[in-house]
A protein has these predicted regions:
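N-terminal glycine-rich phosphate-binding loop for ADP-containing cofactors
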Residues: 1-141
């Protein structure tokens, strides 16, 4: 940020391509568009690198540090004020879209995505207040 003689301020950003400072411009990205995770644009690549790796990490936490997916979701919701935990988020995004992207990139599936796929489950939660267990069966929440 630079300060002008009249006291006003200009927000600037360092442009990595030109290696010079330039005025900051507001980027228009629809953060509610979950399809951006699967876009090959710079925005999509960044979104996947940040959020996709978070979901990947979470899908490997069960059963290592948590006994079930609800514990991971609640920890993220209660501890970090997420509106949805990572497993509920994956259900909204579509677990098989994530699986397809990981397989296309040659990445081994994290544990709970493997469980979901091997048991032909469509989601981590169902509409009967049940969750997919690490063993691949439906258990009460």
């Amino acid at each position: 940020m630079t300060k002008n003689e009249d006291g006003s301020r200009n927000k600037e950003t360092f442009d990595l391509l030109t290696k010079a400072w330039r005025p900051q411009k507001k980027e228009e990205v629809d953060i509610n568009d979950i399809n951006i995770l699967f876009d090959d644009s710079p925005d999509g690549i960044l979104a996947w690198d940040v959020y996709g790796t978070t979901l990947f990490y979470a899908a490997n936490l069960v059963p290592i540090i948590a006994d079930d997916i609800v514990s991971v979701d609640r920890a993220m919701q209660w501890g970090f004020n997420w509106s949805n935990g990572p497993f509920k988020a994956m259900d909204k995004i579509g677990p098989y879209k994530i699986i397809d992207k990981l397989e296309k990139e040659g990445i081994e599936l994290p544990y709970m995505l493997k469980v979901l796929k091997e048991n032909n489950a469509e989601s981590f939660y169902n509409d009967q207040d049940e969750q997919l267990s690490p063993e691949g069966n439906w258990i009460s929440i």
